[in-house]
C-alpha cells in the first residue's frame, strides 16, 4: 500500500455542535426516510472520505429502491443502535443489529428492506461524493452521498 497523497486537517466534532438533518436531493440524499448527522470528515479530508451517522425518520417505511454506487472505493456501515435489513444482489437478505457491520463492494446492487424505529448507523465512504444508480432503470439517483 502506498501512503495517501491527500492532506487532512485536524477535526474535532462535538455532539452538541451537530444535529440530524434531512439532506436536500441536490446535496445527495436519495433516502428521504433518513436524517444525517454530518461529522465534518469530508471537509477535513478534502472529499477523500466522508462519515456520518444516519437515523430513521419516525414513521418512514421501507423499502429503499435497489441501487448501486459507482465511483466509490469503500462503503462501510456499522449499526450503533436498533437494526437494519439489507438485500445484496446474489447474496440474499441480512439483518444487521447493533454491533454488526458490512462493507459493500463497489458496484454491488443492494437495497434497504427494513429498519427499527430507533435505528442509528455510522456510514463511512471513500470518496465522500459518488454516484448512486437505480438498478431498475439505470438512472442516477443523486450525485453525492447515498
Give the location of each predicted region:
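A short beta-loop-beta micro-motif enriched in histidine and acidic residues
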Residues: 44-49, 59-76, 90, 97
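A short hydrophobic beta-strand segment most commonly corresponding to one strand
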Residues: 49-53, 101-103, 116-133
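Short, conserved beta-strand element in jelly-roll/cupin
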Residues: 53-57, 69-86, 124-127
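Short acidic-glycine-tyrosine-enriched beta hairpin
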Residues: 90-107
